[in-house]
């Protein structure tokens, strides 16, 4: 179709599909959930500012993903998982992708600066720089700790959300940063275990390639054990969230640790690695959802009623047990 200035496409729909793959929409959705969680926690309920922040933050994340794909096109060609992506397959040219990334970055900064504040806009741009400069350019091909240090880029979206909502960064925002920072290694290393051969073929020194599955599983468990208490700091001592979030974070954290223990017991099991990777995504999604629900007054009303009902049932069972015990002693 000559009206479309991109090779290897037969229709506009195919062009749009390729550009959608270029920005990695699933990753963006997960990152934006952390932005939303931070804004819910901060108490911002302005729908317009909320929507603009998610749109601007999503554009910044998309720009970073596109630049990353341009830089990594050579190794993507070597990996089975990535060789069909738009750049290594030749469906999109690098210069078109970079132009697209530049437009996204400028639009992101403009939206956030005009409709939220300069701090949020600057943090979004910092996220691009850290992801591209620190992770993609510096660490990804040189250090097995690449995802640990470079993972700071993925922890910036909640800072953007908090800054957009309040115009500043409080301790709660930095706890959110730490939470995502500690969540990233278990999430990414579980995937790296599954794709170990791919990374080895491309010469990328991911931890499972350099150290093997068992040491990687041990590191995953360590980060999971650190993550859970950090997630509870939002309840105490910060008192930003309440009992509903506390229960959700404790349950989700316990399940994450259990999944990590299972992987450590069977570090070569693809099933265990897949289970951990899937649950790590679900963990973050549900945890951020719990942040939003905890800030909703109706949630606390229903939660308190549920706890009161459980206490009533427990008291009734206790009274019944005592009554049966008394009858038994009389008999």
UniProtKB/Swiss-Prot annotation:
It comes from the Bacteria. It is a multi-pass membrane protein. It is an enzyme of class 2 (transferase). Pathway: Porphyrin-containing compound metabolism; heme O biosynthesis; heme O from protoheme: step 1/1. Signal peptide: none annotated. It is found in: Cell inner membrane. PANTHER family: 4-HYDROXYBENZOATE SOLANESYLTRANSFERASE, PROTOHEME IX FARNESYLTRANSFERASE, MITOCHONDRIAL. Carbon 2 of the heme B porphyrin ring is defined according to the Fischer nomenclature. This is Protoheme IX farnesyltransferase. The lineage of its organism: Bacteria, Bacillati, Cyanobacteriota, Cyanophyceae, Synechococcales. The gene is ctaB.
